[in-house]
């Protein structure tokens, strides 16, 4: 019996192991896996139904039509004889093919690629001093559904692209549904929502060739942002490591806009929302991201689902920055209505107000993650919007887009979107209406339905629009003068980074602009960089082989904000993946002990061996292999531990693969490549026994930063765990070319 049967390795497709032969005994459908959860069983009008959690799933032992007619065959069409034509009367064929032809709905025009999870939000109560929102009262628990996403790519695009990530949360409160529709970057490309089609058209694939997919390294994107310079601040964040997060679990979230909280007395406070991951904010490195997109395009989806399945539930604290609701809505010289600006945490600390835990995967991607509909206008009493010109347009766009994507105005009745509060809305009929409304008077006022529905007062939780005095002005198309500064916050962000992070920004700009065909676009963007930081501009220009232009704008300086840096802290390692390389030379008792130690630390151990199956010792239990040299790549693992000698697998071709390692060595070149890549990417590496020779073959000094070796897992695994808490061995990243 394999020793790791007690260790849960996530990723099983079903709750039961399949039989070798096709099952023939009739039985009910299998239940969802323990880590899965569907939408709450509530009616289209928000009433709890009391039905089982999976009551909306398929039922019965036998295959039926959509009308419940049992079928005895679904493998053959009805024909006029075995070689004759198919008959039009084949109702099963027509239903099956017709439904298949209409399975797809329009994908989101942005944020098409996403992953979701269920969870709970528990309020600390600290926000109850400034808002009457019931779900923010002390110790209130609220069900949530979260969808993470990329922005530019299509639904089938890769996860680890350089892009902004969406971070949207649906709170099912007893006062109605509240949606916090955010991103992993606190600023946006544009100030006014009328420019949203422009930035997305520029970032999407070129319309003639439909390339490139899910990336900004092309002419149309840089043509737009170099001309429309209010996009420079967001672009700077995107070129940083924030644009390639390690995981959704290690991603910060931001509400982007300034919102207004309202207390019971009507007093208002301006706030910005923040999600702070308990695991810290961590990213990939660019080479690693590129390899991942080829090896595992579903990297972020898989990571989130596997973490939840293995019990390493992701957690974020919700926090707020608070500001006085003054007439000018400015704070420390920064316009709070400008979505291209953020407020450094050193000026306005983030105050935690609650904890979100994601603890269940969806049971059906389409029904939940694809059909969920977020909208920043889904508000509850105590939370209101501001006059941010991007937010104001989103209030229209997010409602409008659901009508085409989800087939009509009744998208709130889709199970994942149903409120957990009573719904009496006087909205009737329409496509896909699933409520069965009673009464004869869906209008107000009425007497025929007894006057119901009645208007609510504040004493029973009515939403009241904040009375706001509008300054005298004229109707015009222009921004306030405070929106004119396009460079100072990009400078603030860049100069707040460590030298290593600055170097990554330089590399990102150099890569992206190097992919642009037109030199004029590269030159124009260099002019923008010159207005941000001369050293940054010079380093990127050098990489492009172009002269560095001089600044044309006198950009004001600001105090750096260390809070935006990702380097320097120590963080939990829950859910991290550790690859353990083993083979016939390994002491399998030590391999088993290593797996136990990794698992006990809350991480996921995966054994990598020359081939799949099991490693069999002369005595004692065997060890199951999760990855072979053929299927493994360093990018799947946060750390690699070498417990074997890298014996070549049967499918190794040294003559072809030697270029990946050191010619002439008696190791499988893919093992050398795996270890070498892990070293290049700053990952923790451990070794014992024959593993030391593998490090030598890869040219890795055993006293290099982030490298540990010892007699066995009892000494190596604790050091690896400590190294992982810093995410990477940052000492391996010399900041060559970083700006001062």
What do these predicted ranges mean?
Residues 704-740:
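A charged, well-structured terminal subsegment
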Residues 518, 639-645, 667-697:
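Catalytic nucleophile loop
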Residues 2-585, 592-600, 604, 609-631, ...:
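Active-site-adjacent core segments of small-molecule enzymes
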Residues 612-615, 693-695, 714-715:
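Short gly/pro/ser/thr-enriched loop/turn and capping motifs at secondary-structure boundaries
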Residues 634-635:
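A short, aliphatic-rich alpha-helical micro-motif
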Residues 601-603, 682, 699:
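Glycine-centered loop/turn motif at secondary-structure junctions
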Residues 590, 651-654, 695-698:
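Short glycine-/acidic-enriched loop or helix-start segments at secondary-structure transitions
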